[in-house]
Amino acid sequence: MTTITDLYPSRGAAEVSVPRQDPVLWGTPDTPGPITAADLQSYEHDGFLAVPQLIGDDEVALYHAELERLIHDPAVRADERSIVEPQSQEIRSVFEVHKISEIFAQLVRDERVVGRARQILGSDVYVHQSRINVKPGFGASGFYWHSDFETWHAEDGLPNMRTVSVSIALTENYDTNGGLMIMPGSHKTFLGCAGATPKDNYKKSLQMQDAGTPSDEALTKFADRHGIRLFTGRAGSATWFDCNCLHGSGDNITPFPRSNVFIVFNSVENTAVEPFSAPVRRPEFIGARDFTPVR
Amino acid sequence: MTTITDLYPSRGAAEVSVPRQDPVLWGTPDTPGPITAADLQSYEHDGFLAVPQLIGDDEVALYHAELERLIHDPAVRADERSIVEPQSQEIRSVFEVHKISEIFAQLVRDERVVGRARQILGSDVYVHQSRINVKPGFGASGFYWHSDFETWHAEDGLPNMRTVSVSIALTENYDTNGGLMIMPGSHKTFLGCAGATPKDNYKKSLQMQDAGTPSDEALTKFADRHGIRLFTGRAGSATWFDCNCLHGSGDNITPFPRSNVFIVFNSVENTAVEPFSAPVRRPEFIGARDFTPVR
């Protein structure tokens, strides 16, 4: 266990909610980067920022083709970093994609991407986690409400809320095919969940959130206070969101699949220590221990 | 089995798609009723008509209170017309609500409601089915794609597509809480589904569509051709839709429950005969045999 003060206790006997102890924006107004001052303010307030077109159509085609190549590569399929859906035997996610694929590594180093992360986190950044997600339609389940930070803190040992994620759409997100939902402003409250972390929890939690799931009462309070925003947008659009946003997604009964690349940047001044509420670290391809700044 | 010509074969060995053999609008331009000519045309084209406010806030309060009274009445709970969700033991639907509750009976007789049905179907109408639906949040599942007519024809013996449904919202339908989705224009093609009707299929099909479910291939073709429209709207809004619209709903992971009253009007010139593709009739509270015109 970590001896640093645990600002965000979780996975204890009872659910407990505490105000955020960290800023949302760690940079200063003159921290360089592509995000406008107005957008920074709305990110600070809501906890997210929707970018209608982060990458162009030709780049979407490039990354989508690379995604298809990876998920059809037997070597990638055999790699423990690939998450295969039992029934269909189809790949749902490939982790550490920035290490497996040079094309996705370039995307991580792209100033439109890493530049925004540095600007928000006010420092150099490294990749805490990256993955490509391939979510089919025809009833594929969504992902229930959770805060990523609650898991990254409890199971990966990230001390502070100085982490930001970006989900870049490689297919269109309609209002019908189970897109990302966020409760705007929920990032300003930390919800410590009840229930100890089971051993090897990560194996299950990649398919379905269980440990670290808010109670119905908490969800009702959050939703009544904050409402819920659904993110739609064309392929190439992106959603930046603070590590402590309460988010989830519904199932997708449409025939329209959803693919995206998901990158988590963490400040080099917030590197992972030992898990705050879990018996063991998660594997490095899920919670990085390589803190090399993105260059 | 019925000896009338079966215009819409289904539940055979293979899935088969045939063009609609019936008009969508059975009235003539001078058939009286509240729907404008332009709205009638859009209903003919899309197969549905969204009415932003069919009933007022005070009426919503009245009907919502009546819904709450019914689902908390032990006698209603014990009635076979109530569908109780096994795990939570909560009532999900109450059928034949227009017979159980005089308040809902008045709604059925309301000219804003039955007047629209007569106008669309070009004749007197009776209630083929009515129910109140109470769909909680927190992950309650939706209802997969299906055409109601496919079931009403196969299992209730409705000969022709001369039936219209209205879903009147008693709570707000957001873009996040698993609202009704329809493929606009899908009503102009009948999709006969593969697979015989199991005995007592209705007991299962009230919770989850199984017999009468389109294949992935068919859904992909329909969705590519027609797209998918999600219906949102405040409490008091309503969606009228043709009996052969391909429709479904996703799950609801939000805390916001969805309640509605669902009424199916059938033309008195299209009364039920014997099922076209099922061994036995469904119970009368699901597929009426009382053809008394609504007055």
Swiss-Prot record, chains A, B:
Fe cation binds at H146, D148, H247. L-ectoine binds at Q129. Binds 1 Fe(2+) ion. GO terms for biological process: ectoine catabolic process. GO terms for molecular function: 2-oxoglutarate-dependent dioxygenase activity; iron ion binding. It comes from the Bacteria. Disulfide bonds: none annotated. It holds the Pfam family PhyH. Keywords: Dioxygenase, Iron, Metal-binding, Oxidoreductase. The keyword Chaperone does not apply. Transmembrane segments: none annotated. Involved in the biosynthesis of 5-hydroxyectoine, called compatible solute, which helps organisms to survive extreme osmotic stress by acting as a highly soluble organic osmolyte. Catalyzes the 2-oxoglutarate-dependent selective hydroxylation of L-ectoine to yield (4S,5S)-5-hydroxyectoine. This is Ectoine dioxygenase. It comes from Streptomyces avermitilis (strain ATCC 31267 / DSM 46492 / JCM 5070 / NBRC 14893 / NCIMB 12804 / NRRL 8165 / MA-4680). The gene is ectD.
